[in-house]
């Protein structure tokens, strides 16, 4: 659950008040998260985060670069930027440095092989960010864009900026500029007032866009939010049925898209080894850390000696709706 993961990662002491050298790396030794901001200025009517975490605040640019250098010195090869709204980074500072500058600077740190950014708010994704992701070989061609819904009525009720039409155009623009891009989203079904027509619009949208990755959750009331007071509520039974419909559609889409990887080769990082299956669990740039996007299971009959954290070449040999299967090959 990517949202639960973010809340876990974002729920600790403000890192810009910490000495980064006191930090403990609790993830895999070769992969780490870097929180670039605190709080949120978006007032989505289902979310209590702005009430809990306060207004959006970017961490100073040089503080982030220093911490990223420290992580690289500790052996971290992949750095994933996180925040409640990463696209807003730097807009509250007077440094003239924004998300694209942060991606660029971190990617140039010796030892860093890949930089990834999560949680991009749709209407704040600038051409500069798209171009940096497109043109920088050390930035993952991966857009995590939580859109939440596709009915304009529900988007308005959620207090989400932008419309379904805007989102369709944005995704088309990204895919035109970066043909091999991976686009992930999250959706909420059962938001108060969601009716059959609203849900049909969401279904049609999912079938049209064909996201590479999609997570869907049922709405849950949060006290002190506008959504908490909205009526009529959608029943738990209806919400679960709608969730299952979306997931069934996405499973078919994912199965088809995953099979298109077969026969292709990629660079991938080794996360772990499954001794029972005699396979390595690896990720290429299309797979975020912490099992968010499923797995790539790779055999090693190449004769190469490999270790956890190594970057290897793989060839995809098979696929299903959730996972890919590969073999490690020589360059």
What does each of the following model-derived ranges do?
Residues 1-89, 128, 143, 165-176, ...:
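Proteins enriched for Cys/Gly/acidic motifs involved in redox and nucleic-acid/cofactor modification
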Residues 90-107, 111, 157-158, 221-252:
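Radical SAM enzyme [4Fe-4S]-AdoMet core and its adjacent flexible, acidic
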Residues 73-199, 207-208:
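Conserved SAM/AdoMet-binding glycine-rich loop
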Residues 10-12, 97-99, 133-135, 202, ...:
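Short, hinge-like loop/turn segments at secondary-structure boundaries
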Residues 44, 64, 81, 117, ...:
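Conserved, mostly hydrophobic/aromatic
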Residues 77, 113, 212, 217, ...:
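Short acidic/polar active-site loop segments enriched in Thr and Asp
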Residues 229-331:
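Terminal RNA-binding accessory module
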């Amino acid at each position: 659950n990517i949202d639960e993961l973010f809340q876990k990662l974002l729920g600790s002491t403000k890192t810009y008040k910490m000495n980064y050298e006191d930090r403990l790396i609790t993830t895999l030794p070769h992969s780490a998260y870097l929180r670039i901001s605190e709080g949120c200025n978006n007032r989505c009517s289902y979310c209590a985060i702005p009430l809990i975490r306060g207004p959006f605040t970017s961490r100073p640019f040089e503080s982030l670069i220093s911490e990223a250098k420290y992580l690289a010195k500790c052996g971290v090869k992949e750095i994933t930027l996180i925040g409640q709204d990463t696209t807003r980074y730097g807009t509250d500072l007077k440094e003239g440095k924004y998300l694209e500058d942060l991606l660029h600077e971190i990617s140039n740190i010796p030892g860093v092989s890949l930089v990834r950014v999560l949680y991009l708010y749709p209407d704040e994704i600038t051409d500069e960010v798209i171009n940096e992701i497109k043109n920088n070989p050390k930035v993952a061609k991966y857009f995590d864009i939580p859109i939440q819904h596709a009915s304009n009525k529900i988007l308005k009720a959620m207090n989400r900026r932008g419309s379904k039409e805007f989102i369709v155009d944005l995704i088309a623009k990204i895919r035109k500029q970066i043909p091999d891009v991976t686009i992930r989203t999250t959706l909420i079904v059962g938001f108060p007032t969601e009716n059959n027509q609203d849900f049909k619009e969401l279904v049609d949208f999912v079938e049209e866009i064909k996201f590479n990755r999609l997570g869907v959750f049922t709405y849950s009331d949060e006290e002190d939010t506008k959504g908490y007071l909205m009526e009529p509520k959608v029943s738990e039974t209806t919400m679960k049925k709608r969730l299952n419909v979306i997931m069934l559609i996405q499973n078919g889409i994912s199965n088809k898209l995953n099979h298109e990887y077969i026969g292709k080769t990629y660079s991938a990082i080794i996360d772990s080894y499954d001794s029972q299956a005699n396979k390595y669990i690896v990720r290429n740039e299309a797979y975020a850390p912490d099992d968010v996007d499923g797995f790539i299971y790779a055999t090693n009959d190449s004769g190469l000696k490999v270790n956890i954290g190594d970057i290897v070449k793989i060839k995809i040999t098979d696929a299903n709706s959730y996972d890919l299967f590969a073999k490690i090959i020589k360059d």
